[in-house]
Amino acid sequence: MLYFRNDYQVSCIPEINEAFSSLNNQIYEPYGTDSITEHAKEILKSKMKDHDVDIQFVYGGTIANITMIRSLLASYEGIIACKTGHIVMHETGSIEATGHKIIVVDDCDGKVTADAVQKVVNQHQISFDHMVFPKAVYISNATELGTIYSEDELHALHDKCKELGLYLILDGERLGAALMSGVGYTLNDIAACCDMFTIGGTKNGALFGTAIVITNPDLRDKFRYVMKQSGALMAKSWLIALQFIALFENDAFYKNAKKANEFALQIQNSLHNLGYPLLVKGYTNQVFPALTLKQYDFLKEYVSFEIWDKRDDYIIVRFVTSFSTTQEEVNELSEYLKQAAKLG
């Protein structure tokens, strides 16, 4: 069986295993006050040298989103997100469970636009205090569809948020894939476009872990209180920080993502050449082909993948590559795709 189901099905890169083996029962201060965490923060800050940022480490993406959004919103405030957003579709109502409404807008290939944000604010102005007050915007990069924001799109969205008095947060669980897709911007540029954003490790070679980067100084003071209240403050926080050192010290973070993107592009090209329709044209490590029922029934016997959407006469599935994907696996998948294509 080939595994293209997700990008977190293998434990971690060798550098992280080596880092853990070097701990040797040493003693570290708890809750992110240790020397390893400070070192990890300094490494990440060096990637955003034009900005004064605060960094906190949590164990995963959903808890990062919960913590960031809870820290931003009053009880009567909500957050804008597109209909395909991770907090809308794949976090089991975790934001709503905190008492905050997600104001859902249509997406443009998985992306929120400045115009969509303006429309929400215009609609709110009709009823004022009879509606949830829009206070923040949530985006992800790469998006749930594997698409990416251009730097111009990020700046346009950030400028619109500033104009309207909204916070902008970016979910970066697949930020490595976005940065290595050829967009031409860096972590330093991302820091200029958001009030908060995350750098995901779990989907790019770490065992687990997410870095929350707070760029807006007004949002830092009580953030760790919200972390603790949300169950996000780990006693052994250095276990996350150590992984980010291993990811960034010698650029494994970028190498992992580049490799995954390149393999996904090979798969996408094979699909295109074989005549499979694609949901979107992707540039990252996720590929979304449409399969007939016969093609789906054949492929599922040999390949592990996710069903993304079911239509009347075809099924949209998702193939995901990762740091652990091999050329042999990609070649074998291409052979199965050739066989399935003949089934029509």
Where are these regions (language model features)?
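Active-site phosphate-binding strand-loop segment of PLP-dependent enzymes
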Residues: 4, 112-172
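Conserved N-terminal alpha-helix of the aminotransferase class I/II PLP-enzyme fold
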Residues: 13-61, 83-88, 94
